[in-house]
């Protein structure tokens, strides 16, 4: 018998915190909880590697949690805060692109990322939604971000450590209502991949 109780690990509990914060972001209409989900998403892999608990089960759970926290939740926040037919359509497109991106990631064994990672896509969307009070602009951005996620653009998996530390601080600021720095760093990351792709690197 397949017993979840016997195979679940400490890193899986961290992943479940990602799911919980993603769900709460929807229920409470909270942008800040998306940033907290990103922190948990970063920590679960780190904990799994440090504790030697990397598993197929954990990978599947992580993928499901990402759909909730970085696909469904940002899409809901877009529509709920900018109610319009265009926001509805773009929210659906964003969520579908995120799911497709995760499905592709699950079957590829490559160094780095193909397409913008969905946590980065979620950060971009919620950051723009917080700072730009326009359903039209945010709806268009949601579609563009979705297309970036399913593109063939390559992105580095682990930027240098200094970037990671700065990004961690920026996420903490975003959680307390200052998303500007996290959005700027993520935008640089997204543009970096586009420039390298155009140059053929």
From Swiss-Prot:
Q: Which residue ranges run through the membrane?
A: 19-39, 57-77, 88-108, 112-132, 133-153, 162-182
One of its GO biological process terms is: phospholipid biosynthetic process
- Topology versus the membrane: Multi-pass membrane protein
Recorded GO MF terms: CDP-diacylglycerol-serine O-phosphatidyltransferase activity
Q: What class of enzyme is it?
A: transferase
What pairs make up the disulfide bonds? none
State the EC number(s). Answer: 2.7.8.8
Q: Where in the cell is it found?
A: Cell membrane
Choose one Gene Ontology CC annotation of this protein and give it: plasma membrane
Q: Which domain of life is it from?
A: Archaea
Major place of residence? membrane
Q: Record's family?
A: Belongs to the CDP-alcohol phosphatidyltransferase class-I family.
Name of this protein: CDP-diacylglycerol--serine O-phosphatidyltransferase
Which species is this record about? Answer: Methanocaldococcus jannaschii (strain ATCC 43067 / DSM 2661 / JAL-1 / JCM 10045 / NBRC 100440) (Methanococcus jannaschii)
Identify the taxonomic lineage of the organism of origin.
Answer: Archaea, Methanobacteriati, Methanobacteriota, Methanomada group, Methanococci
* Protein encoded by which gene: pssA
